[in-house]
Every structure is written in C-alpha cells, then in structure tokens.
C-alpha cells in the first residue's frame, strides 16, 4: 500500500468501491448474458469455471461485503462439481492448488504460504497495492478466498 498503487478490479467486472445498486445492476447484466446464476438458497452469486480453467468443472460462489455503501470485501468459495469423499483427485487439497494457479493467472502475481506456530492455521496470501487475497481450505470439499480492499477495511476479525 505504501506504493500508492490501487488495484480495484476483483473479477467479472466487479470492483472495489461499487455501490450495492451498481453491484446488483452489474450482476443482473451478467445473469442476462448467462454468465452467472443465483447461488444456493439465493444467498450468493454462482459462476461456473470449466475445465479450460480448472482440472474439473468448478463452482465459484461469491457475495460481497459493503462498508459505508461501498464494496470493500469479497468472500468467495470454490468447489468441484464432481467432488465426492471417495474421489481424492478432487479433494480440497487439489482444489486449493487449482484455485491458487487460477488466481495467480487472473491477478498476475504469486501467493506466499503462511502458517501459525502450531500449524493449525494455514493459508496462502497475495498482496498487490490495496488488494489482499487470502486463500485457505474450508472443509473437505471447499476452498475459501477472501479478497479485501485494505484501503477500505476498518474492522477485521
């Protein structure tokens, strides 16, 4: 952030600083183009990544957080469509590496690996200017990503 360089682009034309109205309007347009759908229980946006981007068809679900009326954080979840407990090739460990490579291609930078002393918390982090991306395993089938605008964040957990 000391460089003063800003990276407001998140993905699919969604940007930090968008109002809720602009976000909904943009998603409505993406939906009309057939690029996105409503996610589970209508609580998220669903985007399907195909095998040209991932090892297996993958769902990406997202819904932003807004602070002072502006998009400041984008929590994202990824899961292979064909995931099953008996299919180790599609475990969250494999998915994590797929998502890591995808995001490195999208954002043009690399992640660094971090863990706490007792190795109970492990994640990959990428910071470019104001945009921080944290990547982690949520459970056996799901990888989480948290894309945050460090200029707009006030209170973090």
Task: Describe the residue ranges of each PLM region.
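Acidic helix-start/capping segments at beta-turn-to-alpha-helix junctions
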Residues: 37-49
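Hydrophobic/aromatic beta-strand elements that line small-molecule binding cavities or substrate pockets
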Residues: 60-65, 135
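Short acidic-hydrophobic surface loop/beta-edge motif
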Residues: 47-51, 124-126
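A short, structured loop/turn motif at beta-sheet edges
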Residues: 65-72, 106-107
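Short, cysteine-centered beta-strand-loop-beta hairpins and adjacent loop/turn segments enriched
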Residues: 52-56, 82-85
């Amino acid at each position: 952030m000391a460089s003063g360089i800003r990276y407001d682009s998140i993905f699919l034309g969604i940007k930090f600083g968008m109002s809720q109205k602009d976000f909904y309007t943009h998603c409505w347009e993406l939906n009309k183009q057939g690029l996105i759908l409503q996610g589970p229980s209508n609580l998220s946006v669903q985007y399907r990544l195909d095998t040209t981007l991932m090892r297996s068809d993958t769902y990406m679900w997202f819904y932003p957080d807004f602070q002072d009326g502006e998009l400041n954080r984008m929590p994202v979840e990824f899961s292979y469509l064909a995931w099953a407990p008996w299919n180790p090739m599609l475990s969250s460990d494999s998915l994590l590496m797929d998502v890591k490579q995808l995001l490195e291609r999208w954002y043009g930078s690399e992640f660094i690996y971090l863990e706490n002393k007792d190795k109970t918390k492990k994640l990959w982090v990428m910071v470019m200017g104001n945009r921080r991306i944290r990547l982690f395993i949520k459970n056996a089938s799901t990888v989480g990503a948290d894309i945050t605008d460090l200029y707009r964040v006030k209170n973090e957990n």
